[in-house]
Amino acid sequence: MIEFLQHKEATIAREILAVQIPAYIKETEIIGFDGIPALQEKVKDIQASHERFAGYRKNGKLIGVISYEKNMHYLTICRLVVHPDGFRKGIGRALLQFVIDHNEDAEKIEVVTAENNTPAVSLYTQAGFQKAETVKAAQGLLLSVFHLYPKRKVEIILYNEKWAECFDEEKERLKLVFGPEIIAIHHIGSTSIPNMAAKPIIDMLIEVRSIEAVSQFDEQMKANGYTPKGENGIAGRRYFQKGGNKRTHHVHMYEQGNPAIERHLLFRDYLRAHPNIAKEYAVLKKQLAAQHPDSINQYIQGKDEWIKTAEENAKRWKKGRNNANGSIVCYNSENDENGGFTL
């Protein structure tokens, strides 16, 4: 059984050391280096740690430990130790997967191990980590730095009436950030279309007075949980995302008058006005999500032709309404971080 550990408690800290010390002693034999700092740790050092600990227990006895630190959506594994009695039983892999599963918003996971620690290198490689660099440490010891970039899961769920409330709440927060720079904030994307099945991500389009002024608010956006992505492939846009790989919000910002604003809004309003077409689109999204659950890019690419056709139909629909009413109507749509639609 794997569980999070309350390492501030002395009894738990002693249990952690009882696993850690023999594990690192074994590692010194493997790598031929006895200067591993963790071998000098005491109970008080474990208790004072800011890392989060999890442990693997068998029949109540702790035989494996993993700890990590997290900064926003970047996670660093600080230690992964298994008591020699638990070697080659899949305990290290289980602990690693536990951390990955409990940090779905992580965009990058880093771990460092001795280059000649063959068991550890094999474990991380099999788990999907890729070697990023080699670092020379004390006494000529070479360390391998591994990175894992977890894939975003494609999740399509039934329409939730609370999405509109989520938009309204976030809208008020963003108004406090950007203040008078904002001209208008629109709810776009599938969560803005009644009864539309969607990825549970609130897409927001913000019209601003000056797109060049947006970057001065990057730190405030970070404080609100957003990651600034700049243009991110679309000229004239400023894009922010929230929630890491467990995405919750996308913010697309354009300067007033940018044609992308009308394109996004027209697409939204076209689907709102045509429930049958929206239903057809929802069916396509569910099919693509089932076919490509681990590839957001393939999911987006699969929608591309449908969206292009719908956009052309939306333009004709708008033109027909303008001709009939003698006035200009509303519009809308949406966009993902890769330049494709999040819808």
From Swiss-Prot:
Residues 135-343 are annotated as: UPF0157. Keywords: Acyltransferase, Transferase. CDD domains: NAT_SF. GO terms for molecular function: acyltransferase activity, transferring groups other than amino-acyl groups. Gene3D superfamilies: 3.40.630.30, Beta Polymerase, domain 2. Disulfide bonds: none annotated. InterPro entries: Acyl_CoA_acyltransferase, GNAT_dom, GrpB/CoaE, NT_sf. Residues 8-144 form the N-acetyltransferase domain. It comes from the Bacteria. Pfam families: Acetyltransf_1, GrpB. In the C-terminal section; belongs to the UPF0157 (GrpB) family. This is UPF0157 protein YqkA. The lineage of its organism: Bacteria, Bacillati, Bacillota, Bacilli, Bacillales. The gene is yqkA.
